[in-house]
Structure formats: structure tokens, C-alpha cells
């Protein structure tokens, strides 16, 4: 039987070799954390390489994602569908082993990591989802949801502000099945961290309410094992402080930043092999080492035991079992489509001139009755974002059966936690803040788009229309930023009907995040036929049309649709042929076929005006260089909203005059 150190050295060898072959990468962290990984993966982690989607598996997140050869080595050695050739293709085009772990490439990768601090935050979301799902479905004698979330993280993760947001909330909510390992190696890219990171990290986490196990030798298997056992037994989230040597095994580069982010070089790898007593050529693992790492039989046994538990649960609680399966499969209720469409039709038949943020709350109220999988929240703005509805019940440390999270003022943390909730499964997460403060959360939304996962954000107070709070709170460029993000759904509805359609599509869209952008001020409901209501889902549609071919097209979104309609009425009265296009979602419109887009925006009608209280430049792709844009080109001002709209040209008079200039 191989020693634990020898089994850990298999990780070190593969990590050295993979980085060397790619001629780029980070060997230091995998070599430093190999002993911890060996103990965790071989003695504690419940997983099944043959079924990486097993619902009750433990989750493992490598928050210090630059050390990706660590997780690739673990997956390969444990028996996942990740071959030695995949490891040889590390960092190569179209490989399953990209430079940072990416969700959806190699089986067993739970989340995309690399932007430091977001992995630990995703893990908080996963642990939160586990605790909530357990509270909703477990019964006495039937602990059907019962798993841990383990995280590796480095000094960089802890320096990032998002780690404070996430770990503070994790302590408050008592996420006892979250166990984090701090790779305390004292090194970052610039060198020894004491010059820029001298926090007392154990005391920091104690202040959060975590269970802290300090000063664990990260190269002592028995000490690591004892720490994990203690962590699992404690009802609080645990930080295991593991003192490690970066690049352990490299005789001349370990303990320095020289091994952090560059290949060791052939000479140093040979020296490391000799130092570690690893006598095998590059990418060669002996059969006995493979045999001791192989987790397939043990994993199949663990999953089979859980399947038997689930069968007993289903026999005792058939309704709950069916509902849990539906939610874990990401399926919507059977009556969803019919009921949701009826809700939208009823809204069109019963006009209400309300703020679209209120329309959003009404949509939550209507759809929420069908969706026990909703897991809502707001970054301390629930009364403003209007994200709570009659069925909302707040999560508390001692009662996790609810469906609403008070995230506090933590926009970035909230959004990345929601990514973890979505990745875990069983929930449709939505969060909220003012549109302006999506800036704090932007990278987590980008990660959701990159991972192709569901993350619904309610962004209210969407323009200068919020008024007196001024330019610090008035978004200008944010809508364009969201729209320009690949695989992001962005909706800015003009009334309660478009708002409900946007919500319906966001709930249905499992492979992308959605930004729902809503107004503070009241908006007039527009008249529509049933066909027009159907066309809302296409992102852009003809709301008002001219008799005969239009000579001018007004394109508007959100609060400016009402303005476009009024201007069109005046121009029509003066004999102009004007079409109004409501375009709540440019990305949805862009996905329509060419025939539909041509029908809405005929290419031979070049007199076009886009009207939106956001950055003007975005709209040239729709109006062309010969068109006009009534939008924002500066930041806003502090003043009542009506004065600001007038000052910045969002008036019927300005639209009419601009149209006449264009048609002259």
C-alpha cells in the first residue's frame, strides 16, 4: 500500500508536468495543497465519478482557480471521465482542461473559478442551498439532503472584498456544512504577503461566527484528517487554517513566488522528482497508485445507499419526493405555461398605470404561487426593489424553511452566492438592487453568463427618473454594459404586461442570467392585441403603426415608450406616418430571424429615432448613422425627476422637433 505522501505526490507530479507541457500555469498551489487534497478526497468527500450530477454529493470548490491542475489531477486520479490526454492538453484550445476550471467542460467541476473570492462565495451559495433544501424536504428519519461543501482558497481570495461579504453572511446564517481550507503559504504573485496582507485571519473568521481551527500543518495527513473530523462535527461553518509550503517538493523554488505562476522548468522538475522520490516519467502514474485513488466503486456504493434512502422517502412522502425530483431536474410545474399566459392576458385586459418595479412585484405575487423553488432576496433594498411578496418567508439561522434571503448591503456577494445556489440546483434564485449598483456585482453576473446558469437580477430605479438622489444613484451606462455582455438577457419593460412577460422568460431561461430593469416612477399601460402580447417575447415589436408604410420609426424602451407613443400621436396628427417599436430586450430581438427583424425595422426606412434614458451610443446599431438618438451623453443631476427629463430632452416637444429635422 502506498503511503499518503506518495499518493499526494501523484498530484504534484501531474501538476508539474501539466504546467510544463502547456508552458504556462500555476504549479505552486497544487503542489502545496496536495496533502490536504489527498486526505479530503480519499477519506471524506462523498462523490461518485460515474455520476458527477448525483444530487446528494459533497461539493468541492477550488476558489484559488489558478491552481487548476490540482482539481484536474484529482478528477483524473479518482476515475472521472478526464483522461491523461486531457491533462496533457492543459490550457490548449477546445480542451476539457482550460487554464482556470470552467463549469461544463470537465465532469466534476462544480463552478468556474479564477476571479479570486468568487469560488468561496459560490460555495456559500451551495451550502445555503443545501441547508434550505434540507429544511424544506427532510423529514424525521429521512435526511435525504445531507452533504458538505468544501472549499480551497488562498490569500488572494481572502484579500478580495467579496470574501468578507460572503463569509460574514455565512457565519450569520450558520452554514455548518461549509468547510473552507485556507492555503496559508504566505506567498502571492508579488512575493511574501506580509507587506500587504497582515490580517489576523483566524480572529477575522471568529468575528464572523465561524469555527476556526488554527495552525494545522498542511503537510501532516493526520493533523489534516483530525481537523476535517472536528469541522464536520461543529454546527458552525469552519475555517481550517492550513500552513503550507507553496511548490512543496521543488528543492529550489518552493516557498517563493517563483513557483506561483510559471513552469518549474525541466531541470527543477527533475530535481523535484528526486526530492519527492517520484521515479516515474512525465504523465505516468503506476497502477497501484491509480488503484488506491480510484473512487468509482466507493462512489457507486454511496450513491446506491442514497438511492435506497430516497426510495424509502418516496414511499413515505410521495408528493414531496416527486416535487424534489422536479426541482432538482430544473423542471417547471405542469400547469406553468397555461397559467402564466393567462396571468399575462389578464394584465393586458386590466390596465394599471404603475411603476414597473411594482409590476415586477405583482408578477412575483402571481408566479410565486406556482414556484416553491423561488429563492428571492435583495441587497438591503426590499422596500425599494419590491422583491418580497405575500409568500416570502425570510431565512434565519435557526429556520431555513423560507424562500427569501436578506443579503444585507452586499451586491457582489449576493450575486455570486446566487450563482452557487443556481449551480447547486433545486432553486430559481432572484436578487435585487438599484441598477446603479449592479456595478458592484458586475463580474458575478458575467460569471453567470459565462457558465450559462440562471441568475435573475431585479434592477430598479433605472434612470434619471429616480430624481433627487442624483448622479451617484442614477444609472447611465449600465444598461449598455449588461446588453453588451455575451449570453446575458436584459429586459427593460414599459408597463405591467411587458414586465410579466420578462419575468416569465427569466424563470424559463435556465442557461443564462437575466437582468430585469424596472422604473421607480409610474408608467402608462399600452394597448395591445393578443398578437402583440405574444410578440413581446421577441424583444422588439410594433406597438403602434402608421396607415401604410412608415416614413419614421421611433424605437423606445421602458419609461420612454410612453413618450414615443405621445410624440407619434402628435406627428400623426400633423400628417406624418410614424411607427413606434417597443424594444424591451435588444438581445431577444437580435436573435429573431432576419424576416421578422426586417418586418419590424424595414431597412429602407432610414429615418429612425431611438429614445432611452441611458447612454446614447448603444443605439446606433438600430438607427444607423443617419438616425437620431435621444439619450444620455453625460451623468445626471440631483433634481426632481420631471425637471431632469425635461433638461435632458425626454419631452414630446423634443422628440417631435427631432423627427421634423430628420424628415426635412
From Swiss-Prot:
Q: Which InterPro entries match?
A: THDP-binding, Transketo_C/PFOR_II, Transketolase-like_C_2, Transketolase-like_Pyr-bd, Transketolase_bac-like, Transketolase_BS, Transketolase_CS, Transketolase_fam
Q: By its UniProt entry, which Pfam families does this protein fall under?
A: Transket_pyr, Transketolase_C_1, Transketolase_N
Binding-site positions, thiamine diphosphate? 66, 114-116, 156, 185, 260, 437
Q: What is its EC number?
A: 2.2.1.1
**Where do the catalytic residues lie?**
411 (proton donor)
Q: Which domain of life is it from?
A: Bacteria
Reactions the enzyme catalyzes: D-sedoheptulose 7-phosphate + D-glyceraldehyde 3-phosphate = aldehydo-D-ribose 5-phosphate + D-xylulose 5-phosphate
Q: Which GO terms describe its biological process?
A: pentose-phosphate shunt
CC per GO annotation: cytosol
Asked if the keyword Metal-binding belongs to this entry, the reply reads yes
What's the record's note on cofactor binding?
Binds 1 Mg(2+) ion per subunit. Can also utilize other divalent metal cations, such as Ca(2+), Mn(2+) and Co(2+). Binds 1 thiamine pyrophosphate per subunit.
Q: Tell me which stretches of the chain form a coiled coil.
A: none
Which positions does the site annotation Important for catalytic activity cover?
A: 26, 260
The family this protein is said to belong to: Belongs to the transketolase family.
Q: What does this protein do?
A: Catalyzes the transfer of a two-carbon ketol group from a ketose donor to an aldose acceptor, via a covalent intermediate with the cofactor thiamine pyrophosphate.
Q: What's the name of the protein? A: Transketolase 1
Amino acid at each position: 500500500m502506498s503511503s499518503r505522501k506518495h499518493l499526494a505526490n501523484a498530484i504534484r507530479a501531474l501538476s508539474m508536468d501539466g504546467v510544463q507541457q502547456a508552458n504556462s500555469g500555476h504549479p505552486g498551489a497544487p503542489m502545496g495543497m496536495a496533502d490536504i487534497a489527498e486526505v479530503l478526497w480519499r477519506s471524506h468527500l462523498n462523490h461518485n465519478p460515474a455520476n458527477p450530477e448525483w444530487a446528494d454529493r459533497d461539493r468541492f470548490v477550488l476558489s484559488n482557480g489558478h491552481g487548476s491542475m490540482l482539481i484536474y489531477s484529482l478528477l483524473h486520479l479518482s476515475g472521472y471521465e478526464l483522461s491523461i490526454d486531457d491533462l496533457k492538453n492543459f490550457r490548449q484550445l477546445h480542451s476539457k482542461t482550460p487554464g482556470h476550471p470552467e463549469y461544463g467542460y470537465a465532469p466534476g467541476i462544480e463552478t468556474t473559478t479564477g476571479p479570486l473570492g468568487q469560488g468561496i462565495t459560490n460555495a456559500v451559495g451551495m451550502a445555503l442551498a443545501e441547508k434550505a433544501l434540507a429544511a424544506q424536504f427532510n423529514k424525521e428519519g429521512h435526511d435525504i439532503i445531507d452533504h458538505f461543501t468544501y472549499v480551497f482558497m488562498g490569500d488572494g481570495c481572502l484579500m478580495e472584498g467579496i470574501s468578507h461579504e460572503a463569509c460574514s453572511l455565512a457565519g450569520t446564517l450558520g452554514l455548518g456544512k461549509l468547510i473552507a481550507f485556507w492555503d496559508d503559504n504566505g506567498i502571492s504573485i508579488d512575493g511574501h504577503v506580509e507587506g500587504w496582507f497582515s490580517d489576523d485571519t483566524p480572529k477575522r473568521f471568529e468575528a464572523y461566527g465561524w469555527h476556526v481551527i488554527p495552525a494545522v500543518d498542511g503537510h501532516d495527513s493526520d493533523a489534516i484528517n483530525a481537523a476535517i473530523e472536528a469541522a464536520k462535527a461543529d454546527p458552525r461553518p469552519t475555517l481550517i487554517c492550513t500552513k503550507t509550503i507553496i511548490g512543496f517538493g521543488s528543492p529550489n523554488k518552493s516557498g517563493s513566488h517563483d513557483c506561483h505562476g510559471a513552469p518549474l522548468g525541466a531541470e527543477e522538475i527533475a530535481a523535484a522528482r528526486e526530492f519527492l522520490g517520484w521515479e516515474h516519467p512525465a504523465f505516468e502514474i503506476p497502477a497501484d497508485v491509480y488503484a488506491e485513488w480510484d473512487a468509482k466503486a466507493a462512489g457507486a456504493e454511496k450513491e446506491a445507499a442514497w438511492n435506497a434512502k430516497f426510495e424509502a422517502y418516496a414511499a413515505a412522502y410521495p408528493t414531496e419526493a416527486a416535487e424534489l425530483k422536479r426541482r432538482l431536474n430544473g423542471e417547471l410545474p405542469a400547469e406553468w405555461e397555461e397559467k402564466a399566459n393567462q396571468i399575462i392576458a389578464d394584465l393586458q385586459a386590466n390596465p394599471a398605470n404603475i411603476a414597473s418595479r411594482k409590476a415586477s412585484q405583482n408578477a412575483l405575487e402571481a408566479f410565486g404561487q406556482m414556484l416553491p423553488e423561488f429563492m428571492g432576496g435583495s441587497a438591503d433594498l426590499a422596500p425599494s426593489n419590491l422583491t418580497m411578496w405575500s409568500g416570502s418567508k425570510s431565512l434565519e439561522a435557526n429556520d431555513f424553511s423560507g424562500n427569501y434571503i436578506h443579503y444585507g448591503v452586499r451586491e457582489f456577494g449576493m450575486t455570486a452566492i446566487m450563482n452557487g445556489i443556481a449551480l447547486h440546483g433545486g432553486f430559481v434564485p432572484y436578487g435585487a438592487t438599484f441598477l446603479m449598483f449592479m456595478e458592484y456585482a458586475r463580474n458575478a453576473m458575467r460569471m453567470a453568463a459565462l457558465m450559462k446558469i440562471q441568475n435573475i437580477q431585479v434592477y430598479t430605479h433605472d434612470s434619471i427618473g429616480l430624481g433627487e438622489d442624483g448622479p451617484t444613484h442614477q444609472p447611465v451606462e449600465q444598461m449598455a454594459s449588461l446588453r453588451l455582455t455575451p449570453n446575458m438577457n436584459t429586459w427593460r419593460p414599459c408597463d405591467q404586461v411587458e414586465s410579466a412577460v420578462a419575468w416569465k422568460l427569466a424563470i424559463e431561461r435556465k442557461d443564462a442570467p437575466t437582468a430585469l430593469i424596472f422604473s421607480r416612477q409610474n408608467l402608462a399601460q399600452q394597448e395591445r392585441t393578443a398578437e402583440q402580447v405574444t410578440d413581446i417575447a421577441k424583444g422588439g415589436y410594433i406597438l403602434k403603426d402608421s396607415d401604410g408604410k412608415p416614413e419614421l420609426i421611433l424605437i423606445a424602451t421602458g419609461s420612454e415608450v410612453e413618450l414615443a407613443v405621445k410624440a407619434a400621436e402628435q406627428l400623426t396628427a400633423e400628417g406624418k406616418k410614424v411607427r413606434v417599436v417597443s424594444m424591451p430586450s435588444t438581445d431577444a430581438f437580435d436573435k429573431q430571424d432576419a424576416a421578422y427583424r426586417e418586418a419590424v425595422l424595414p431597412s429602407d426606412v432610414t429615418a429612425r429615432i431611438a429614445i432611452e434614458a441611458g447612454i446614447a451610443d448603444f443605439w446606433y446599431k438600430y438607427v444607423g448613422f443617419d438616425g437620431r438618438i435621444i439619450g444620455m451623453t453625460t451623468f445626471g443631476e440631483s433634481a426632481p425627476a420631471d425637471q431632469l427629463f425635461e433638461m435632458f430632452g425626454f419631452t414630446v416637444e423634443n422628440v417631435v422637433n427631432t423627427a421634423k429635422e430628420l424628415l426635412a
